[in-house]
Amino acid sequence: MGAGKTTFYEAYLKEPFPTLVPPLRHQQQPFLDERRSFAVEDIRVDTQLLERAKAAGYSTKVLFISTEDANLNVGRVLVRMSRGGQAVTVSSVIDSYRESTKNLSEVSKYADELLVYDNTAHRRGFCVVAHLIAGKLSKTAQTIPDWAAKVFGKELHPAEQHEKPGRGR
């Protein structure tokens, strides 16, 4: 809650994936059975859904969005509530923040692609932190946010800065 998942979906995913299925197995299964594309927005990545989707022949892609601090998420949710959004408790926002990263480091074993975004900076947009393909690190940001470093440990190494060759004499 408050990391920007819905905002990201509305801005970037709604057109290619117009069907946003709730994170409920009984509502997802018909899509899997009929091999229809869909997106799921949830606080925690459902690795069982990824396994079922892969078994059904799907290519799976997880887009994970977080921020540096649960208090930032709380602030965003409070603003949203002041504008008529769904009322939630501060403790549930903090709990969902903690819960969201619990299995994230394992997700790359289940998803064909995992894109990790940081949405900490106000009005600067979603920043790609890491892109993993088939469990292998494809690219990382030059600066890894602390929250991502805690989740992935040494798995994420900042992209190497290559010096430009100097001019000969």
Residue positions per predicted region:
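A short linear boundary/processing microfeature
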Residues: 14-15, 68-69, 79-83
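Conserved SF2 helicase motif VI
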Residues: 74-77
